């Protein structure tokens, strides 16, 4: 009996992909989300991501105004930082250049090391500031215009001690007619020793041997050590005033005098270099003579300092450099004076003349032979003691 018929294997037929029917229209999904579209019968390498066919337009950015060509937006923070760094570097280079330029123009011509028998140094720093009648660099026309005369050599028209300390700055005017002892000294050029010459006017010491003997005489009669020396002549003074555009002052009364050449009317006005020089030089026609002149000099320095150290001058190179050039070209200082020392002197002057310190004449006891002025030595000793110990000044004129 035959066995059961074996099971037949049907050949496997691979059917082709059936075409998809039409996609039914999507119903409106909640919250406006568009469902992903189904594949249209081919292997789509991009299908499967959630962002495909969802209505998102690729290459159009995120709606924040991106570059249509795919370039990154500018990094303004980085640009600002680079700009600031560049400005700082430029300012640094200019500052360094200005420092070396100014330092090269300083006339370090006074050697204080040759001054003999110097007093012991105290606290703070003491400057001797001198205005001389030097006519160096002035033509005949300039001398006539500035009423300087034609006297050979040079003398001192003003002398001031400026003390810079932690307890306040002090400026003391020394009348040129002060009756003092000119001590023995060694000639700055000859090297010869000269004996003391007895009482004389203070400015006579400058006439004999210039700055070194003047410093020696001031130290000998006060007991106060002078740390630095600064001197400016007629021409330099007038140039500085003209460089800042003149100095505004309130003239208390009409002033006219032929020796100084001053001719000013009462009231507030701007003095040019010529007028300013006449104002600080005048002593004839003033009730107090040399004492009144020192007060006028203090008033003018106050106005000059306050009007020079302003943003309109310091931050304006077209004004700052002419002012610095005019001052440095004619300013004579000691060999150890640095630009920092000079700046300290200037700012202390501005502080004092602006009311932030003490401004006074050397205390006077009365008159002396030859129209001289005798110092009140009791007050002078107290004043020097306060300065040497850097104490607030309590002495009055």
Please identify what each model-predicted range represents:
Residues 2-397:
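Non-catalytic, solvent-exposed segments at the cell envelope interface
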